[in-house]
Protein backbone atom coordinates (compact mmCIF):
# COMPACT_ATOMS: atom_id res chain seq x y z
CA UNK A 1 0.00 0.00 0.00
CA UNK A 2 1.09 3.57 -0.67
CA UNK A 3 0.74 6.40 1.81
CA UNK A 4 0.63 10.12 1.25
CA UNK A 5 2.72 12.33 3.54
CA UNK A 6 0.57 15.23 4.73
CA UNK A 7 3.14 16.65 7.14
CA UNK A 8 6.87 16.11 7.52
CA UNK A 9 7.67 16.18 3.80
CA UNK A 10 11.10 17.70 4.39
CA UNK A 11 12.04 15.01 6.90
CA UNK A 12 10.77 12.28 4.58
CA UNK A 13 12.77 13.76 1.69
CA UNK A 14 15.96 13.84 3.79
CA UNK A 15 15.49 10.19 4.78
CA UNK A 16 14.97 9.25 1.12
CA UNK A 17 18.15 11.10 0.09
CA UNK A 18 20.20 9.47 2.86
CA UNK A 19 18.76 6.07 2.02
CA UNK A 20 20.01 6.41 -1.55
CA UNK A 21 23.40 7.67 -0.39
CA UNK A 22 23.96 5.06 2.33
CA UNK A 23 22.43 2.00 0.72
CA UNK A 24 23.59 -0.45 3.41
CA UNK A 25 22.60 1.66 6.41
CA UNK A 26 19.25 0.32 7.64
CA UNK A 27 18.41 3.29 9.85
CA UNK A 28 17.50 5.36 6.78
CA UNK A 29 15.18 2.67 5.39
CA UNK A 30 12.29 3.37 7.76
CA UNK A 31 10.87 6.45 9.45
CA UNK A 32 8.56 6.77 12.43
CA UNK A 33 5.18 8.19 11.47
CA UNK A 34 1.61 8.53 12.66
CA UNK A 35 -0.87 6.84 10.33
CA UNK A 36 -4.09 8.80 10.15
CA UNK A 37 -7.54 7.34 9.47
CA UNK A 38 -8.29 6.74 5.80
CA UNK A 39 -11.37 8.98 5.80
CA UNK A 40 -9.75 12.03 7.41
CA UNK A 41 -10.95 15.24 5.73
CA UNK A 42 -9.16 18.41 4.62
CA UNK A 43 -10.24 20.44 7.64
CA UNK A 44 -8.78 17.88 10.03
CA UNK A 45 -5.53 17.82 8.07
CA UNK A 46 -5.31 21.61 8.16
CA UNK A 47 -5.90 21.59 11.91
CA UNK A 48 -3.10 19.05 12.41
CA UNK A 49 -0.69 21.22 10.43
CA UNK A 50 -1.60 24.33 12.44
CA UNK A 51 -1.39 22.51 15.76
CA UNK A 52 2.01 21.09 14.86
CA UNK A 53 3.71 24.19 13.51
CA UNK A 54 1.96 27.20 15.02
CA UNK A 55 1.84 25.90 18.59
CA UNK A 56 3.90 22.69 18.64
CA UNK A 57 7.53 21.86 19.42
CA UNK A 58 8.65 22.45 15.84
CA UNK A 59 7.22 25.87 14.93
CA UNK A 60 7.59 27.26 11.45
CA UNK A 61 9.44 30.50 10.82
CA UNK A 62 7.29 33.65 10.72
CA UNK A 63 7.44 33.53 6.91
CA UNK A 64 6.28 29.90 6.78
CA UNK A 65 3.44 30.63 9.21
CA UNK A 66 2.30 33.49 6.99
CA UNK A 67 2.44 31.24 3.95
CA UNK A 68 0.17 28.74 5.70
CA UNK A 69 -2.26 31.50 6.68
CA UNK A 70 -2.26 32.64 3.05
CA UNK A 71 -2.89 29.08 1.82
CA UNK A 72 -5.79 28.57 4.20
CA UNK A 73 -7.34 31.94 3.39
CA UNK A 74 -6.90 31.90 -0.39
CA UNK A 75 -6.78 28.22 -1.37
CA UNK A 76 -8.94 26.67 1.35
CA UNK A 77 -11.33 29.64 1.63
CA UNK A 78 -10.93 30.06 5.39
CA UNK A 79 -12.38 33.39 6.55
CA UNK A 80 -10.43 35.72 8.85
CA UNK A 81 -12.95 34.95 11.59
CA UNK A 82 -12.32 31.22 11.24
CA UNK A 83 -8.56 31.72 11.24
CA UNK A 84 -8.92 33.85 14.38
CA UNK A 85 -10.63 30.96 16.16
CA UNK A 86 -8.06 28.41 15.00
CA UNK A 87 -4.88 30.42 15.58
CA UNK A 88 -5.87 32.74 18.48
CA UNK A 89 -4.44 35.61 16.43
CA UNK A 90 -6.33 38.85 15.84
CA UNK A 91 -7.86 39.36 12.40
CA UNK A 92 -5.61 42.39 11.85
CA UNK A 93 -2.50 40.28 12.60
CA UNK A 94 -3.64 37.60 10.19
CA UNK A 95 -4.39 40.15 7.48
CA UNK A 96 -1.05 41.94 7.93
CA UNK A 97 0.87 38.65 7.80
CA UNK A 98 -0.94 37.49 4.67
CA UNK A 99 -0.40 40.84 2.95
CA UNK A 100 3.27 40.89 3.96
CA UNK A 101 3.67 37.37 2.53
CA UNK A 102 2.05 38.46 -0.74
CA UNK A 103 4.30 41.53 -0.89
CA UNK A 104 7.39 39.36 -0.58
CA UNK A 105 6.22 36.70 -3.01
CA UNK A 106 4.93 39.04 -5.70
CA UNK A 107 7.33 41.98 -5.54
CA UNK A 108 10.34 41.40 -3.32
CA UNK A 109 11.60 37.84 -3.85
CA UNK A 110 11.42 37.92 -7.68
CA UNK A 111 14.09 40.65 -7.53
CA UNK A 112 15.98 39.79 -4.32
CA UNK A 113 15.82 36.02 -4.32
CA UNK A 114 18.61 34.78 -2.07
CA UNK A 115 17.31 32.16 0.44
CA UNK A 116 18.38 34.39 3.34
CA UNK A 117 16.08 37.20 2.19
CA UNK A 118 13.08 35.49 3.79
CA UNK A 119 14.40 36.38 7.25
CA UNK A 120 13.44 39.98 6.39
CA UNK A 121 9.77 39.03 6.52
CA UNK A 122 9.31 41.06 9.72
CA UNK A 123 10.22 44.22 7.75
CA UNK A 124 7.17 43.70 5.57
CA UNK A 125 4.89 42.94 8.52
CA UNK A 126 5.99 46.20 10.15
CA UNK A 127 5.39 48.03 6.86
CA UNK A 128 1.85 46.68 6.59
CA UNK A 129 0.76 47.23 10.19
CA UNK A 130 2.11 50.80 10.53
CA UNK A 131 -0.82 53.24 10.32
CA UNK A 132 1.34 56.23 9.40
CA UNK A 133 2.95 54.33 6.54
CA UNK A 134 -0.50 53.30 5.29
CA UNK A 135 -1.43 56.98 5.08
CA UNK A 136 1.74 57.77 3.12
CA UNK A 137 1.06 54.89 0.72
CA UNK A 138 -2.52 56.06 0.18
CA UNK A 139 -1.25 59.59 -0.54
CA UNK A 140 1.24 58.22 -3.06
CA UNK A 141 4.23 59.47 -1.05
CA UNK A 142 5.83 56.03 -0.90
CA UNK A 143 5.29 52.83 -2.86
CA UNK A 144 5.75 49.17 -2.07
CA UNK A 145 8.27 48.98 -4.92
CA UNK A 146 10.41 51.69 -3.30
CA UNK A 147 10.22 49.94 0.05
CA UNK A 148 11.28 46.63 -1.53
CA UNK A 149 14.35 48.28 -3.02
CA UNK A 150 15.31 49.90 0.29
CA UNK A 151 15.07 46.53 2.03
CA UNK A 152 16.93 44.73 -0.76
CA UNK A 153 19.69 47.34 -0.79
CA UNK A 154 20.26 46.85 2.94
CA UNK A 155 19.09 50.30 4.03
CA UNK A 156 17.67 48.87 7.28
CA UNK A 157 19.47 46.91 10.00
CA UNK A 158 16.39 45.35 11.61
CA UNK A 159 12.63 45.16 11.32
CA UNK A 160 12.13 47.63 14.16
CA UNK A 161 13.61 50.36 11.95
CA UNK A 162 10.42 50.34 9.89
CA UNK A 163 8.47 51.69 12.85
CA UNK A 164 10.26 55.03 12.41
CA UNK A 165 10.22 55.06 8.62
CA UNK A 166 7.24 57.43 8.46
CA UNK A 167 9.24 60.04 10.42
CA UNK A 168 11.96 59.88 7.80
CA UNK A 169 9.58 59.99 4.85
CA UNK A 170 7.82 63.06 6.21
CA UNK A 171 11.09 65.02 6.12
CA UNK A 172 12.53 65.67 2.66
CA UNK A 173 16.16 65.92 3.79
CA UNK A 174 15.94 62.77 5.89
CA UNK A 175 14.26 60.90 3.02
CA UNK A 176 17.06 61.93 0.69
CA UNK A 177 19.62 60.60 3.18
CA UNK A 178 17.75 57.29 3.17
CA UNK A 179 17.86 57.14 -0.62
CA UNK A 180 21.50 58.21 -0.89
CA UNK A 181 22.91 56.41 2.14
CA UNK A 182 21.02 54.43 4.80
CA UNK A 183 18.22 54.56 7.32
CA UNK A 184 20.76 55.25 10.06
CA UNK A 185 22.03 58.30 8.17
CA UNK A 186 18.44 59.44 7.71
CA UNK A 187 17.83 59.21 11.46
CA UNK A 188 20.95 61.24 12.17
CA UNK A 189 19.67 63.93 9.81
CA UNK A 190 16.24 63.82 11.40
CA UNK A 191 17.64 63.95 14.93
CA UNK A 192 18.64 67.56 14.35
CA UNK A 193 14.97 68.60 14.40
CA UNK A 194 13.39 65.64 16.24
CA UNK A 195 15.37 64.21 19.21
CA UNK A 196 12.94 61.28 19.45
CA UNK A 197 14.21 59.96 16.11
CA UNK A 198 17.15 58.16 17.78
CA UNK A 199 16.62 58.60 21.52
CA UNK A 200 14.54 55.90 23.23
CA UNK A 201 13.92 58.26 26.16
CA UNK A 202 12.55 61.01 23.93
CA UNK A 203 10.60 58.39 22.00
CA UNK A 204 8.85 57.23 25.18
CA UNK A 205 8.14 60.83 26.22
CA UNK A 206 6.62 61.47 22.79
CA UNK A 207 4.45 58.33 23.05
CA UNK A 208 3.15 59.41 26.46
CA UNK A 209 2.43 62.91 25.15
CA UNK A 210 0.45 61.48 22.22
CA UNK A 211 -1.49 59.30 24.65
CA UNK A 212 -2.45 62.31 26.77
CA UNK A 213 -3.52 64.39 23.80
Give residue ranges: language-model regions:
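Accessory, typically intrinsically disordered or conformationally flexible segments
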Residues: 1, 23-29, 86, 113-213
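A sequence-level detector for short glycine-anchored, His/Arg-bearing signature motifs
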Residues: 1-24
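Glycine-rich loops and low-complexity Gly/Arg-rich segments
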Residues: 18, 57-61, 119-121
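Amphipathic, charge-rich alpha-helical segments that serve as recognition/docking helices
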Residues: 25-106
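Basic, glycine-/proline-tolerant helical and adjacent loop/strand elements
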Residues: 110
Amino acid sequence: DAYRVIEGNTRAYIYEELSEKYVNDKKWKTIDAYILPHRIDRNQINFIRLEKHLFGQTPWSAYEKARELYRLNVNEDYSFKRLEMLTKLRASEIQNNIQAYMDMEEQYLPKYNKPTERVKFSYFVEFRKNKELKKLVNKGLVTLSEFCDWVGEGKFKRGEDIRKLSLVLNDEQAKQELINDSFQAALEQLEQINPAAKSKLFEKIEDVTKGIT
